[in-house]
């Protein structure tokens, strides 16, 4: 593996770690209606599990409600069940093929729990970044040992790997800070 490929590979892995964090944070309820809350909901449909978005239309008519318009009348009860099983703290209110999900306001205590959870996700992502950095540094040592790169180049590339790690770590911090503000906004 050459040095350019190594840098791109590390950057790609760090980018994936950041995307995983984004996905985890989307699942945290902020007290505002967002169809992203339902990304993790799967529904038993036609003999297999399907994402909710493949059996219904999702919309947010206001800041406190999510509407789920089920396309097939026979699917309404399994959509309700899927939403309940997802354990999102939402109570479905069914009206024909339309399921309304009122978003309850968050208590201060629940907001604090969500902030702690967001910080935990951030810390897990930083651990992933450090593991990626460690793997990159081990690869650099191997390249130096195999005489593919010189000692000074190894040092220079190690600094670049560290800078890349620091950059992504600060991105994680800013994403978490932004999510914290979103959660704490009443």
Swiss-Prot record:
Name of this protein: Ribosome-recycling factor
Pfam name, any one: RRF
Main location: cytoplasm
Subcellular location per the Swiss-Prot or TrEMBL entry: Cytoplasm
InterPro entries, alphabetized: Ribosome_recyc_fac (IPR002661), Ribosome_recyc_fac_dom (IPR023584), RRF_sf (IPR036191)
Family statement drawn from the similarity comment of this UniProt entry: Belongs to the RRF family.
SUPFAM superfamilies xrefs: Ribosome recycling factor, RRF
Function: Responsible for the release of ribosomes from messenger RNA at the termination of protein biosynthesis. May increase the efficiency of translation by recycling ribosomes from one round of translation to another.
GO terms for biological process, alphabetical: cytoplasmic translational termination
A GO CC annotation given for this chain: cytosol
MF GO annotations: ribosomal large subunit binding
Bilayer-spanning residue ranges: none
Protein keywords: Cytoplasm, Protein biosynthesis
Matches recorded under CDD domains: RRF
Matching Gene3D superfamilies: 3.30.1360.40, Ribosome-recycling factor
């Amino acid at each position: 593996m050459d040095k350019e490929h190594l840098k791109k590979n590390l950057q790609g892995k760090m980018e994936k770690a950041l995307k995983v964090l984004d996905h985890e944070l989307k699942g945290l309820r902020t007290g505002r209606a967002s169809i992203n809350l339902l990304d993790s909901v799967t529904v038993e449909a036609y003999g297999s599990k399907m994402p909710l978005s493949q059996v219904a239309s999702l919309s947010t008519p206001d800041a406190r409600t999510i509407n789920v318009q089920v396309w097939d009348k026979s699917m309404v009860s399994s959509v309700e069940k899927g939403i309940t099983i997802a354990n999102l703290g939402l109570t479905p209110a069914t009206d024909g093929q339309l399921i309304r999900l009122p978003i309850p306001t968050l208590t201060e205590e629940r907001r604090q729990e969500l902030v702690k959870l967001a910080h935990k996700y951030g810390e897990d992502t930083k651990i992933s970044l450090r593991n990626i950095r460690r793997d990159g540094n081990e690869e650099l040592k191997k390249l130096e040992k195999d005489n593919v790169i010189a000692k000074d180049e190894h040092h220079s590339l190690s600094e670049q790997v560290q800078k890349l790690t620091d950059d992504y770590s600060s991105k994680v911090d800013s994403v978490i800070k932004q999510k914290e503000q979103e959660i704490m906004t009443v």
